[in-house]
């Protein structure tokens, strides 16, 4: 299991660096070749991925009886789609959007209740309920969800913050995210080696997420006073400690599940991380637009225009009004960074209370 930790560190470094490198490459491609290039570049990457997958060595495992779970799949889809649409409706903070948002939330709750009931009865459930009853596994999966929420919302909204609030170009925004990518890769590799040597697991995300939470508080309250170099250094530091999580989560659930359910356990981590990323980004966007609309509806419209057309094509306003709108947008991003800090704080407590502390 300890050697597995080292290789999980490699995998986590590659996977998370790929996630954070996307905005870096996207900014440069948009600046040089236009926004269409960020979609076209995925074609050769997908073909390369398919080729590498085809060349993987085959590994035969013991076959187990399996039955599809179409009811679980439908209920899960209804739950996720309705809840995300409800969060999107709440971003408008308009009275005419509230009935639809409330109805979608209610539909999501009903679908969730029915989903839990279905998964406890299905012979081959979409969601491995039996595994999730184990404290070490459900806490690790919840930690993966919090990590996904914090990381993906960060790499989604930091580029917007840099361009809209600080006036950076897409290319310079991409370059400012390079330290975050380097930090995450380095943190994942170092954590994998430390777990392999010491056998300790949760101590690393406990310490790492505490530091990340402090970093997010610095971004929330003092980012406007940071120069470009200081901000790049903060993102490097932030990434270094964000890299302490995913490798530990994977090796923890694999150790807790046993060899027969190793695949289910590993899949549950990626599943949880993806769900956390989707919901986390939607929640942060809801907080951002809610605060902005509450402070200044005109600023919300201006921000939406900046998001759609770019900073240079926003509405022409007197300098004093532009400064006021910029201040309101900066305040909304403060709330967004605090929402991200809430995710990392929850992850900190999940890691702290995980019963599997050594492997």
Pin down the residues of each PLM region.
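12-transmembrane solute porter fold
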Residues: 71, 97-107, 111, 123-295, ...
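Cytoplasmic helix-loop-helix junction between adjacent transmembrane helices
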Residues: 1-13
């Amino acid at each position: 299991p300890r050697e597995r930790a080292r290789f999980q560190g490699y995998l986590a470094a590659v996977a998370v660096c790929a996630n954070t490198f996307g905005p870096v490459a996207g900014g440069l491609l948009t600046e040089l070749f236009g926004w269409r290039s960020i979609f076209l570049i995925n074609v050769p990457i997908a073909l390369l991925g398919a080729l590498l997958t085809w060349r993987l060595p085959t590994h035969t495992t013991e076959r187990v009886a399996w039955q599809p779970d179409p009811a679980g799949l439908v209920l899960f889809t209804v739950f996720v789609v309705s809840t995300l649409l409800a969060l999107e409706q709440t971003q408008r903070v308009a009275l005419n959007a509230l009935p639809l948002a409330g109805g979608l939330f209610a539909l999501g709750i009903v679908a969730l209740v029915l989903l839990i009931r279905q998964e406890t009865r299905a012979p081959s459930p979409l969601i491995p309920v039996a595994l999730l009853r184990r404290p070490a596994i459900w806490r690790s999966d919840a930690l993966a969800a919090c990590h996904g929420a914090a990381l993906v919302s960060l790499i989604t909204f930091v580029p917007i913050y840099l361009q809209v609030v600080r006036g950076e170009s897409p290319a310079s925004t991409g370059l400012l995210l390079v330290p975050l990518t380097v930090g995450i890769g380095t943190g994942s590799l170092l954590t994998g080696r430390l777990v392999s040597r010491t056998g300790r697991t949760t101590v690393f995300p406990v310490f790492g997420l505490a530091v990340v939470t402090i970093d997010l508080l610095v971004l929330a309250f003092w980012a406007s006073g940071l120069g470009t170099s200081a901000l790049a250094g903060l993102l490097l530091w932030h990434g270094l400690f964000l890299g302490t999580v995913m490798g530990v989560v994977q090796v923890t659930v694999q150790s807790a599940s046993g060899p027969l359910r190793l695949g289910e356990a590993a899949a549950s981590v990626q599943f949880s991380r993806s769900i956390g990323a989707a919901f986390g980004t939607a929640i942060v966007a809801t907080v951002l637009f809610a605060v902005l609309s509450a402070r200044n509806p005109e600023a919300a419209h201006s921000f939406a225009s900046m998001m759609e057309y770019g900073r240079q094509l926003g509405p022409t306003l007197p300098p004093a009004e532009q400064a006021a709108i910029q201040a309101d947008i900066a305040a909304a991003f403060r709330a967004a960074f605090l929402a991200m800090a809430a995710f990392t704080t929850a992850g900190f407590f999940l890691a702290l209370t995980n019963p599997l502390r050594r492997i």
